[in-house]
Amino acid sequence: MKREQLYSGKAKTIYATDNPDTLIAEFRNSLTAFNGEKKGEMEKKGYYNAQISKKIFEMLEASGIKTHFVSMLSDIEMLVKKVEIIKIEVIVRNIAAGSITKKYPMKEGTIFESPVLVFDFKSDEYGDPMLNDDIAVALGIATREELATLRKLALRINELLVPYLDEKGILLPDFKLEFGRRDGEIILSDEISCDTCRFWDKKTGQSMDKDVFRFDKGDISKAYEEVARRIVPEIFE
């Protein structure tokens, strides 16, 4: 089924399949931070992220959110629907953390009264700058109607994710989403994992995500494994 490699990103490799409507996303063990300036490897990282993403995609699908997920072909290979990626990173923030506390007078750990939603231009060349609607439209990235849809979907996903993770003892300070166009609709794509979310332990406040690698906070392998144990405990049975 797997055919030629189409693209290799920071954490996944994308392959064509015999079906022009589907692709294979292979989750790798590579770690990157600061736009690729810091690099590393972690055993089982691809496995944990793939399994976490699968479980969350299934939960979202069951709640009416359309995603690109089709099935798992192996522990690290996900069959996905082919989409036209919208070059916008949609960031949803529930708790002040990371870059927002450096750019604005916000104290880390501050809980927002309502989610803060930010659009960034998905471009390594330009350093993923923040977008407003006018710039996004001027760049031809999306229409105003599509931007409204992205907001609606992102906030709905947040409404589903926060209680889902809370039950597992995980806080969700913020996370990044990517979407794509398919058959006239906008659907969730990419992944939802320790690479794309900030996960904090509900009791201790400790990071259980890529920040552990980014800022040398401890054992990155244990952090990802702990999240996997809480979200997909069945893979450890």
UniProtKB/Swiss-Prot annotation:
CDD domains: SAICAR_synt_PurC. Pathway: Purine metabolism; IMP biosynthesis via de novo pathway; 5-amino-1-(5-phospho-D-ribosyl)imidazole-4-carboxamide from 5-amino-1-(5-phospho-D-ribosyl)imidazole-4-carboxylate: step 1/2. The keyword Oxidoreductase does not apply. SUPFAM superfamilies: SAICAR synthase-like. Transmembrane segments: none annotated. GO terms for molecular function: ATP binding; phosphoribosylaminoimidazolesuccinocarboxamide synthase activity. InterPro entries: SAICAR_synt/ADE2_N, SAICAR_synt_PurC, SAICAR_synth, SAICAR_synthetase, SAICAR_synthetase_CS. Its EC number is 6.3.2.6. Keywords: ATP-binding, Ligase, Nucleotide-binding, Purine biosynthesis. It catalyses: 5-amino-1-(5-phospho-D-ribosyl)imidazole-4-carboxylate + L-aspartate + ATP = (2S)-2-[5-amino-1-(5-phospho-beta-D-ribosyl)imidazole-4-carboxamido]succinate + ADP + phosphate + 2 H(+). GO terms for biological process: 'de novo' IMP biosynthetic process; cobalamin biosynthetic process. HAMAP family: SAICAR_synth (MF_00137). Belongs to the SAICAR synthetase family. This is Phosphoribosylaminoimidazole-succinocarboxamide synthase. It comes from Methanosarcina acetivorans (strain ATCC 35395 / DSM 2834 / JCM 12185 / C2A). The lineage of its organism: Archaea, Methanobacteriati, Methanobacteriota, Stenosarchaea group, Methanomicrobia. The gene is purC.
